[in-house]
From Swiss-Prot:
Subcellular location(s) of the protein: Cytoplasm
Organism: Homo sapiens (Human)
Keyword entries, A-Z: Aminotransferase, Cytoplasm, Pyridoxal phosphate, Transferase
Membrane-spanning intervals of the chain: none
E.C. number(s) listed in UniProt: 2.6.1.1
Name of protein: Putative aspartate aminotransferase, cytoplasmic 2
Record carries keyword Nuclease: no
Length: 421
């Protein structure tokens, strides 16, 4: 007699963007290229790791004084202090006033998981979330699984080929009172002083709760302070907010999942209350965060010589990415590819938009075996001397083949004020 399975009614899960990598791996084409890795890549096509991280990791592994005990639920205290100083600056108003703290988490996914659980329990009026489209696959489902209604928004204008500050202001103007607003790094969204003032005013008057995502500080401009300028604006205006801080990508410790949920409160008393609740939630989620990556990062951040080496390694990575973008733009211009390609070099960070429409992206994936996310945002560190010609020639071919049809015209998204996930 056959045994009934507990799992017989379990269906296949909805495929996420991660299935693009699965499709790539199943492709037998010898010249296939994947341009959507989350990690920073070297010119040799391997995940980038700072040399100072490798050196420090080796030293720690050989330290006979380490007893490899479990960390406290809140994490390594020295790591939290060093990471907060990195994020806000040692002389930050919030740090001086003792109204900022953090919980050591299992990467940025752990930070969102912890933060969303807290909001579900203690911010019960907020059941609507607007999340920037670049984070929707990674973190939108966390909110959705917790019972939030999730909408995505984008500040990328496919016609102007830039991050448009007017779109951001329009989004905030139209989203409902009391919702959660998840914001990534909008360093390329050139808000004027009056634009910043308007943004702050709307968020404050609508009692919107900001939840920032800082996944790779230092890999946008190589200036650690400039990369988190948006947080300084909000701190100076007395806002309270959450921030997911990931330190895996900018240190090249991808396998450790090193992150922190940062809490900025109105005062120290409220901060302590929030942290106490987060400790209980973290205890149920993972009890003890991972140790090794946090020790490596703390050792570097607390040693001026090692910190200088790390900053220099970030500068070299950013310069290499900028050079890659310049080469891509120049090659497309030399090929006579229709369109303006200046937007490629005007974007900061490892990831950026190519400015292609959905038909052109589909052509590259299906015909050229160049795997690009549907939104056309790629990881430029995946482009190197071995594949740049094939990639740019493929883009040129895709644009030329769709140029004469209406499909080649960028269609304005209807996601400016949100599409429900």
């Amino acid at each position: 007699m056959p045994t009934l399975s507990v799992f017989m009614d379990v269906p296949l899960a909805h495929k996420l963007e991660g299935s693009l990598l699965k499709t790539y791996k199943q492709d037998d084409y010898p010249n296939k290229i994947f341009l959507a890795y989350r990690v920073c890549m070297t010119n040799e096509g391997h995940p980038w790791v700072s040399l100072v991280v490798q050196k420090t990791r080796l030293q720690i592994s050989q330290d006979p004084s380490l007893n490899y005990e479990y960390l406290p639920t809140m994490g390594l205290k020295s790591f939290i202090q060093a990471s907060l100083a990195l994020l806000f600056g040692k002389h930050s108003q919030a740090i001086v006033e003792n109204r900022v703290g953090g919980v050591h988490t299992v990467g940025d996914s752990g930070a969102f998981q912890l933060g969303v659980q807290f909001l579900r329990a203690w911010h019960k009026d907020a059941r609507i979330v607007y999340i920037i489209s670049s984070q929707k696959e990674l973190h939108g489902l966390v909110f959705q699984d917790m019972g939030f209604t999730v909408y995505e928004y984008s500040v990328w204008d496919p016609k102007k080929l830039c991050m448009d500050p007017d779109i951001l202001l329009n989004v905030v103007e139209q989203i409902p009172h009391g919702c959660v607003l998840v914001m990534g790094n909008i360093i390329d969204c050139k808000l004027t002083p009056s634009g910043w003032a308007k943004l702050m005013s709307m968020i404050k008057s609508k009692q919107i709760f900001p939840f920032f995502d800082i996944p790779c500080q230092g890999l946008y401009t190589s200036d650690l302070e400039e990369d988190t300028r948006i947080l300084q604006y909000f701190v100076s205006q007395g806002f309270e907010f959450f921030c997911s801080q990931s330190l895996s990508k900018n240190f090249g410790i991808y396998d450790e999942g090193v992150g922190m949920l940062v809490v900025v409160a109105v005062n120290n008393q409220q901060l302590l209350c929030v942290l106490s609740q987060l400790e209980g939630l973290a205890q149920a989620l993972w009890l003890n965060p991972p140790n090794t990556g946090a020790r490596v990062i703390t050792s570097i951040l607390c040693n001026p010589a090692l910190l200088g080496e790390w900053k220099q390694s970030l500068k070299e990575v950013v310069e290499n990415i900028m050079l890659t973008k310049e080469k891509v733009k120049e090659k497309l211009q030399l090929l006579g590819t229709p369109g303006s390609w200046g937007h490629i070099t005007e974007q900061s960070g490892t990831h950026g938009y190519l400015g292609l429409n959905s038909q052109q992206v589909e052509y590259l994936v299906r015909k050229k075996h160049i795997y690009i996310p549907k939104n056309g945002q790629i990881n430029f560190s995946c482009i190197n001397a071995n594949n740049i010609n094939y990639i740019t020639e493929g883009i040129n071919e895709a644009v030329l083949l769709t140029e004469s049809s209406e499909m080649c015209l960028p269609k304005e998204k209807k996601t400016l004020i949100g599409i429900k996930l």
